[in-house]
A protein has these predicted regions:
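Class II aminoacyl-tRNA synthetase catalytic cores and aaRS-like
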Residues: 1-199
Length: 199
């Protein structure tokens, strides 16, 4: 046999983790000869599609071939190597926007000149939140090892979105417009910024 599938019970005798099934569970064991990565994808993706289509209780399942994301792109856009693509929030690299002459945020420019990058994370429908909401996020970021978070609140003024908040005054109108376009921002959104060396 050059290949076979085997569905069998598995007894896990090791420490449990959040992404592991504890104790007994069923697994699909695959043995294949003389294959490469693409052969594995072509064999497995239809099985997963049929499995979740038949037993997914009516939930929508992506059709093969499944979307593939490079590790570096996944870490940049989602902050994890196993993202939940149902979550619409993405992380954006806005380093080049911070280099603009009409952005006067000198602390970021200084860090960028030393090799740092700037990432931005939108927070939909949060611009009307109280100051304590933003302070809590900032404190959390510091607890996680970041130097802090800058943020801009987007509000509509005469049919145009404008940037408010602690660092909004350092951005010219054209720079705000580019942020809105690049980061897919809308009215009442907040955009958080973090600047540090890439890790």
């Amino acid at each position: 046999f050059d290949k076979y599938f085997q569905i069998a019970p598995c007894f896990r005798d090791e420490d449990s983790r959040a992404d592991r099934s504890p104790g007994e569970h069923y697994q699909l064991d695959i043995e294949m000869s003389f294959v490469e990565q693409e052969d594995i994808f072509k064999s497995i993706e239809p099985i997963f599609f049929e499995l979740f289509t038949q037993f997914g209780k009516g939930k929508v399942v992506s059709k093969p071939p499944f979307q593939r994301i490079k590790y570096k792109d996944s870490m940049l856009k989602y902050g994890t190597d196993k993202p939940d693509l149902r979550n619409p929030i993405e992380i954006f690299d806005v380093t080049e926007i911070m280099r603009r002459e009409d952005v006067k945020l000198d602390i970021f420019k200084k860090l960028i000149s030393k090799g740092s990058i700037v990432r931005a994370i939108p927070a939909p429908n949060t611009s009307s939140k109280p100051r304590s909401f933003f302070d809590e996020f900032n404190n959390w970021a510091k607890d996680e090892g970041a130097k802090g978070l800058g943020y801009i609140l987007l509000e509509k003024n005469k049919e145009k979105l404008t940037g408010k908040g602690p660092i909004g005054k350092f951005f010219a109108k054209k720079a705000i417009e580019e942020l809105i376009k690049v980061c897919k921002l809308r009215e009442n959104d907040t955009i958080f910024f973090s600047c540090d060396t890439e890790k």
